Amino acid sequence: MESPPHPLLLLLTLLVAAGAASAGADDLVAELQSLRSRSPSGVIHLTDTSITRFLSAPAPRPYSVLVFFDAASLHSKTDLHLPQLRREFALLSASFLAHNPASADLFFADIEFSESQHSFAQFGVNSLPHVRLVRPEHTRLAGSEQMDQSHFSRLADSMAEFVESRTGLEVGPIVRPPLVSRNQMILLVILFLVSIPFLIKRIMDGETLFHDRRVWMAGALFIYFFSVSGGMYGIIRHTPMFITDRSDPNKLVFFYQGSGMQLGAEGFAVGFLYTLVGLMIAMVTHLLVRVESLQIQRFTMLAVMIIGWWAVKKVILLDNWKTGYSIHTFWPSSWR
């Protein structure tokens, strides 16, 4: 009968195994940091092989990984906003790295469907956009935590809230690149200083755009059209001009039935009808009254009423089709 292993030998074996595991984890962290340093935004591009190496390592791992799932073939689908979300994800990574340059607790990565279909299947991803947080204790990729769609609403800022609430790490303010670079700003200032004498002369002579009433008229029309077409709503909500029909990918949808969403095309269509009526009223009150021919005035007024009735009818029908609400006519009681 063999004697049991000596306790000292068993302890030594366990220490060697723990040291090897620690060294392996340190090697993974060092490799991730090296890959991160090669990326301008700090986002590490992973494939099936690297996902197995970094995310299937024995738990608990000393790091978490936030993974963005991408598909280049779907970038043309404007309703998914994949290119924009990918840029915001890169901003999130760069901002975290700017505020935590030496952090090895969280890494940002992306994978592409055509290169890593096996990993998509392991995560159980079947729709995009999709972001997963793989924490140190996760032993299965499918068991990682999915970012809710609501965290895409404010782009990088809402993604940062998800990261901070799930990891306890502070991302810090999102660092966005300036619209104008330093050299461009210097050039603009120089051009402005050089043009000051010429601007003063044109202002004194009354030859600027601000002295042209046609410019003010065009600006007023643009503001009116922009307001009635829901342009500000489209900018705030990032609504697309149109979407692809789910039942027929080759068909485009310009009018969305339902009050929960408005496409840019339908807003512009309604804005055009409103602007058309406004222009006709302006023409009648400012131009038609100067026409001396009574027949031309009557014919023009009849045409304006017909076109105005058609435009208002189209707006009412579209509103009824979209929201389900109907507009009823109420006559004065004395007319009944």
Curated annotation (Swiss-Prot):
Stated role: Subunit of the oligosaccharyl transferase (OST) complex that catalyzes the initial transfer of a defined glycan (Glc(3)Man(9)GlcNAc(2) in eukaryotes) from the lipid carrier dolichol-pyrophosphate to an asparagine residue within an Asn-X-Ser/Thr consensus motif in nascent polypeptide chains, the first step in protein N-glycosylation. N-glycosylation occurs cotranslationally and the complex associates with the Sec61 complex at the channel-forming translocon complex that mediates protein translocation across the endoplasmic reticulum (ER). All subunits are required for a maximal enzyme activity.
Protein's UniProt keywords contain Nucleotidyltransferase: no
Keyword Transmembrane: yes
Family annotation (PANTHER family): DOLICHYL-DIPHOSPHOOLIGOSACCHARIDE--PROTEIN GLYCOSYLTRANSFERASE-RELATED, GH11935P
Cytoplasmic face of the membrane: 205-215, 289-298
Lineage: Eukaryota, Viridiplantae, Streptophyta, Embryophyta, Tracheophyta
Stored InterPro entries: OligosaccharylTrfase_OST3/OST6
Membrane topology: Multi-pass membrane protein
Biological process, per Gene Ontology: protein N-linked glycosylation via asparagine
Subcellular location per the Swiss-Prot or TrEMBL entry: Endoplasmic reticulum membrane
Pfam families found in the cross-reference section: OST3_OST6 (PF04756)
Gene3D superfamilies per record: Glutaredoxin (3.40.30.10)
Signal peptide: 1-25
Record key words, sorted: Endoplasmic reticulum, Membrane, Signal, Transmembrane, Transmembrane helix
Subunit field text: Component of the oligosaccharyltransferase (OST) complex.
Name of the protein in question: Probable dolichyl-diphosphooligosaccharide--protein glycosyltransferase subunit 3
Family, as annotated: Belongs to the OST3/OST6 family.
Lumenal topological segments: 26-183, 237-267, 320-336
Cellular component terms (Gene Ontology): oligosaccharyltransferase complex
